[in-house]
Amino acid sequence: MYIRELNAEEYENFAKNHKYANYHQTLNYAMLKSEHDYEYEIIGFCDDDTIYAAALVLVKLIDGYLYAYVPEGFLIDYENESLVRLFTDELIKYYKKEDINFIKINPSIIISEIDPKTHIKTYTDNYPIINTLERCGYIKLNDNTNFESILPRVNAIVNLNEFNINNLSKNTKNKIRKGIRKGLTFEVAENSQMNYLNEFTKRKIKRSEFYYSDYYNIFSRNHSIDYFLVSVDYEKYILNSQMAYEKELKKNERLNNKVKNIPKTRNINTKMNSDKTLLAYKNDIALASKNLNKPFKEYIAGALVVKNGDTATILISGYDKKYYDFAPNYFLYFMIMNYYQNEYKYINLNGITADLSKENKYHGLNEFKLGFKPHIYEYIGEFDLVINPHIYNKLLKKGLLEKEFNKN
């Protein structure tokens, strides 16, 4: 068996039904990265007309030295150690000729499911693949706690067959209903509106202003990406707030009579809470009235979603922090799940941290995603296959590997 370059048709036919198929291992992703500092190759491990493994391999320079990166790992049967070993041996020979100094992989192999309450891990049958890769010469890198690596090590994935607003956390349900009451609307957007997403996410991650537009242009060629925006419908906001105010006013009048007849602390506190709610609704009506005749649509949140196989993945999302009280991020995620529920099996909410403690600086992000009741999966992590130890150790000692790959 030997390694050779595959043409587009060969690769797509092999990849589309593979167990580890993912959007990072697609021709679309190859084209995207080729516009943002990488070269790429599509390779296969073959014997005559049979392909046993394949990969999109990205190539880049660090300090004048070439390295390769295989996002989400090779498309190969990792449980077949003899196949992995043969492939790896040929891989080293193949890329040594191309002056590649090391190959980084982060396979999309789930090794455990984490209980969001107890944080206890239940390991899968894939866990021994760590030892398989190490025996085949791959160096297992330290597992990250937060978001230090290229891709998140822990992902939150919602099974859409289980998805129902009634199953969500109380806080999440309340935030979604608040967004609905405040007149939030959800729409499919176009690439020409990508400036909104760039604005919503500019403090979250540093990207070229053209990066997400390029993403959309390339992935939309085969309809494997969607762009969504959330705006405020102030007319709906007024109507909803008026209805809520009138309903609460009737409740408040009943509570007022109750306090007069039974002036207990509990009744007084309930009446005071109702007074606060009435004031909030009154302020909502005033705010909506003030903005009712704005000459433009006001977008306050957005997301890009990539589709591959039976999974839709929220690639990036963000919202205007001025509208925090509208809970637009909760409304956005809820509507995305509704949008895909009849077409896809899973929604990948993307990364959360391995450290789920309250003390973690990403606790708010974790709790936001956990409120949608996802399954929490831990992936196998990053491995390096060293081809030129001298150059690899040189880059390591100079801190250039950490600079290139550590995302914190």
Show which residues each predicted segment covers:
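A conserved beta-strand-loop-helix scaffold within acyl/acetyltransferase catalytic domains
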Residues: R4-D48, A53-G64, Y138-E148, E162-F163, ...
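Active-site/acyl-donor-binding loops of N-acyltransferases
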Residues: E5-A8, M31-L32, K117-F163, Y346-N408
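Short, high-confidence coil segments that cap the C-terminus of an alpha-helix
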Residues: Y38-Y40, K97-I100, I225, N342-Y344
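Glycine-/proline-rich flexible loop or hinge segments
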Residues: L66-Y78, F102, I111-I114
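A short, internal acetyl-CoA/4′-phosphopantetheine-binding micro-motif in the GNAT/acyltransferase core
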Residues: G73-N80, S317-D325, T353
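Conserved acetyl-CoA-binding loop-helix of GNAT-fold acetyltransferases
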Residues: E81-K93, Y324-N338
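Acyl-donor-binding surface of acyltransferase catalytic domains
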Residues: V84-T185, A189, E209-S213
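A structural signal for short, well-ordered beta-strand segments and their strand-loop junctions
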Residues: N101-N106, E187-A189, L229, Y346-N350, ...
